[in-house]
């Protein structure tokens, strides 16, 4: 993929937070991160809790302080934008969070939730209502869903509503922050398939943040693995999730559960052997 086709370019980005105390150095959450996301591409960002993967998503959204390097969107530096410029950019960059229930206003109907971002940007009520009908159809929810409240839906259905809201203004990039981790396995699969279906139809790009290598294997074109604020491995999704070169990625792969109890037992033994081998190498 050429540079002209890159939608997002993350170039040597650092994110630091001040630490209370006299002359204490700031906490560096991200260190020299470089990554690209192409138009219509899904890049999976995987790592354990505290690895910095969510912070990178927040940096793209303008919610984390970039203290070094820069983030470019369609060739334009966005890591230094002010609030007003950021608001204008929200048409092109949207987000889907982990817990749809907390990200949806419980007092608003689905119709109000989906029309709000359209009406505030000048869309007429008639066009907004038409767009909502289309959005509900795109995420496979019934037409009468618009009259109901978020609490009347299952977790998977609520996440479909959150996806519909993110799609309402036809974004070019959606940052997906652990969007299926709160769902059961069967629902995860249907929501992941929905993300793929939407991408095939619209050409939207995803940064897919997760701790689960099996999820990124299912949905991603490329994968970047994060550990302690740095990218330790990146490459083609099939390669990284099957034959990783970094010990940390190998550990993540062995930690992922599998439904077959025999394979799970084998993986458990492989994990123990790998841990013993790593300890011996360190010693």
What residue spans do the PLM features occupy?
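ABC transporter nucleotide-binding domains
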Residues: 1-255, 267-283
